[in-house]
Amino acid sequence: MIDSDGFRPNVGIILANEAGQVLWARRINQEAWQFPQGGINDRETPEEALYRELNEEVGLEAGDVRILACTRGWLRYRLPQRLVRTHSQPLCIGQKQKWFLLRLMSDEARVRMDITSKPEFDGWRWVSYWYPLGQVVTFKREVYRRALKELAPRLLARD
């Protein structure tokens, strides 16, 4: 599903532990790290997509987490030209994302990257909340900055 402007609707997931650290995942067979994220299917709400992606990419169920906050609007990034599939229709030039801040409520041992036949990640670690800003690929950096900034007050507010 790609909108009329060429952006694919997507959810981004910031999963925090009790210490306020966030889950940082390594893309399979790469040295690229990022937050879990994934597309929103037709007739699927952002929250439904969040739980589906959380399970597919991190192995967690709805009962393992609590939603602390969600960004108010869509945050967009454009793909670098080298990543745009110019022969695909409709043309996708980037992603528009709703970001969710989650608190892990179960044991971290439940995090599993290998429950699907095509895993996206092969490793993960806990990092400080702002660490991803200096590490994520450049074209996603501004969206990360905006999402982290908007959601930070909810992480700092003790539930």
From Swiss-Prot:
Keyword Iron-sulfur assigned: no
Required cofactor(s): a divalent metal cation
Motif Nudix box per record, residues: 38-59
Domain Nudix hydrolase: from-to ranges: 6-149
Role, per record: Accelerates the degradation of transcripts by removing pyrophosphate from the 5'-end of triphosphorylated RNA, leading to a more labile monophosphorylated state that can stimulate subsequent ribonuclease cleavage.
PANTHER family: M7GPPPN-MRNA HYDROLASE
EC numbers: 3.6.1.-
Protein's organism: Pseudomonas aeruginosa (strain ATCC 15692 / DSM 22644 / CIP 104116 / JCM 14847 / LMG 12228 / 1C / PRS 101 / PAO1)
Record GO cellular component, one term: cytoplasm
Keywords: Hydrolase
Molecular function per GO: mRNA 5'-diphosphatase activity
Enzyme class at the top of the EC tree: hydrolase
SUPFAM superfamilies registered for this protein in UniProt: Nudix (SSF55811)
Alphabetical GO biological process terms: mRNA catabolic process
This protein's name: RNA pyrophosphohydrolase
Family as reported in the entry's similarity comment: Belongs to the Nudix hydrolase family. RppH subfamily.
HAMAP family hit by this protein: Nudix_RppH
